[in-house]
Amino acid sequence: MNKRNKVKHLNRNKGHRDALINNMITSLFKYERIESTQAKLKVVRSHAEKLITRAKKNLVTDLKPEVQLHNKREVMKRIKDREVVVKLFEDIAKRFETKNGGYTRVLKLVNRISDNSEVGILELTSRKERSTLLKERIEKREIQTKAREEKRATRKSNSAPVNKETTSKKK
């Protein structure tokens, strides 16, 4: 009798397995490519495809705001990083708008030397070039640093000058 075969356990308990899958999905959407063992990649692939489909549902214009919010919250159960969620809904979902599946692919690599495990790469099929990804990250960092500097400047200008007379000393 084959029991307990609906879920790939990956030799981990449920909490560890869920954390592993969530982290790998986040990395996949952030870097658009991850490398790991074949067994892990197959599990992550199914979850990632479901999340992309969920994000694509928000592209429909006549969708109720409650449904859009529900879709976003369902995705945020798996992906904790808000920047990655925004990227999924605004960038990745639009790239796959015309496709009805097959958003990811698993490429097999040579077995790992140390333990002879099957290794592969999971990547998005319509992946951006590495140079454009790096440019986007650099631009994003520059924008963030400018915002931080402006915030610091406003804090300095808004801080009231300290009046020595008003600060009371114990008499």
Swiss-Prot record:
Pfam families: Ribosomal_L17. GO terms for cellular component: cytosolic large ribosomal subunit. Residues 156-165 have a biased composition (Polar residues). One of its GO terms (molecular function) is structural constituent of ribosome. It comes from the Bacteria. InterPro entries: Ribosomal_bL17, Ribosomal_bL17_CS, Ribosomal_bL17_sf. Residues 140-152 have a biased composition (Basic and acidic residues). One of its GO terms (biological process) is translation. Signal peptide: none annotated. Residues 140-171 are annotated as: Disordered. Keywords: Ribonucleoprotein, Ribosomal protein. Part of the 50S ribosomal subunit. Contacts protein L32. HAMAP family: Ribosomal_bL17. Belongs to the bacterial ribosomal protein bL17 family. This is Large ribosomal subunit protein bL17. It comes from Leptospira interrogans serogroup Icterohaemorrhagiae serovar Lai (strain 56601).
